[in-house]
Amino acid sequence: NVGGGLGINYDDPNGQPIPNFKEYFDTYAQHLVLREGQQLHFELGRAVVGQCGALITRTLYVKQGTYKQFAIVDAGMTDLIRPALYQATHKIENISSDEPCEVYDVVGPICESSDVFAKSIEINKCHRGDLIALRSAGAYGEIMASQYNCRQLPKGYVTEDL
């Protein structure tokens, strides 16, 4: 066991090339001598599929608070728990708007204070109905989803248009 898989760049999903796995494995082959019958196992994880998925959610409401502005979306921590579970960050984009950016807290509809995808981020101005993409959700998004609070599991779709 040589540890966990290769990481990904959550801040710039389009800027990360597909890893050169041959080069990666060759490094181990040069430095590890296996005895007869031994095997080497890798967990490739996020490097293979992390950038292949995005959570697409719809803006339910835009709420102007006293000190901040909220974009409340229909996805919640049940659909992508990484931000709530260990403060993971995902690039978030309003894919319905070309308007100038504004600062939002992007939150889900679940009655939990941890149902937050991001705080104080700049994204294109949000309106009710806008589609919001949480990028880099391909590795552990769907598999870690839950039906907490009677919510349905997210559905997966395949597209090349994002």
Model-derived regions, located:
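Alpha-helix-loop-beta-strand connector modules within alpha/beta enzyme cores
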Residues: 22-35
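Charged (often Lys/Glu-rich) extended helix/loop segments that serve as interaction or gating elements
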Residues: 38-162
